[in-house]
């Protein structure tokens, strides 16, 4: 990656799973590895699909690709699930925000998790109400998550937050399919997320002025990056 802080973790996850049984089981292991892989690809400036943003690009493919690879679903089902996910993202974008700069990471990874949760419910034959409950639970689980990229790069903690978003989506989908409901209606959850995002201080909305970006580690990475830029300009 640009800073050298990101890269190789997806392969480490695959290697770990090949050597021993993971705590989370085969499917979730693939979800984790795929989320890392796609998010690392973004950090390394490779081609990705923003879903709904580049910073959250690993969540949706992380839950869908393993199912397709296993032959659990066909291409037509995946396409339908992607339409469901897109519809969810459009609603969240209209009622709240999908931008970390305006709503924090809850608006990016949180929305991606909601999209993925809804897509999974659709793949398993769930109806609109269950999709709504999955979306609500996925959003509630990440409510208030701040956007605090170290040195302003979409690397730390962004890559690993894609993993949390994907695993969150799986748990929300399974709960909804089990008949577990969100007590707060999904539209109200979305509106609440938008309100929370607007209340976040500017330091916690992609400015790299607060949160993990403001830690001694974060500041050291920023200083090294600025020093490197200065040296490049002198050349």
What annotation goes with each model-predicted range?
Residues 1-49:
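Extended amphipathic alpha-helical scaffolds
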Residues 45-48, 98-104, 153-156:
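Active-site-adjacent structural elements in folded domains
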Residues 45-63, 105-112:
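Conserved phosphate/anionic-ligand binding catalytic regions in large, soluble enzymes, centered on
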Residues 93, 98-106, 112-113, 117, ...:
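N-terminal glycine-/lysine-enriched basic segments
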């Amino acid at each position: 990656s640009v800073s050298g802080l990101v890269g190789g973790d997806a392969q480490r996850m695959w290697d770990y799973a090949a050597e021993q049984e993971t705590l989370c089981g085969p499917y979730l292991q693939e979800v984790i590895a795929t989320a890392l892989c796609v998010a690392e690809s973004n950090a390394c400036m490779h081609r990705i699909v923003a879903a709904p943003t580049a910073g959250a690009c690993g969540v949706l493919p992380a839950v869908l690709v393993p199912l397709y690879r296993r032959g659990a679903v066909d291409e037509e089902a995946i396409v339908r699930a992607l339409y469901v996910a897109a519809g969810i993202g459009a609603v969240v974008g209209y009622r709240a925000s999908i931008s970390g700069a305006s709503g924090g990471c809850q608006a990016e990874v949180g929305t991606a998790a909601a999209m993925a949760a809804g897509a999974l419910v659709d793949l398993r034959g769930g109806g609109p109400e269950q999709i709504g409950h999955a979306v609500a639970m996925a959003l509630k689980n990440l409510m208030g998550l701040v956007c605090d990229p170290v040195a302003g790069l979409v690397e730390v903690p962004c890559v690993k937050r894609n993993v949390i978003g994907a695993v969150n989506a799986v748990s929300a989908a399974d709960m909804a399919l089990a008949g577990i409901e969100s007590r707060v209606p999904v539209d109200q959850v979305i509106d609440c997320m938008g309100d929370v995002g607007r209340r976040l201080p500017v330091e916690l909305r992609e400015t790299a002025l607060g949160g993990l970006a403001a830690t001694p580690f974060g500041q050291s990475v920023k200083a090294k990056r600025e020093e490197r830029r200065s040296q490049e300009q002198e050349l």
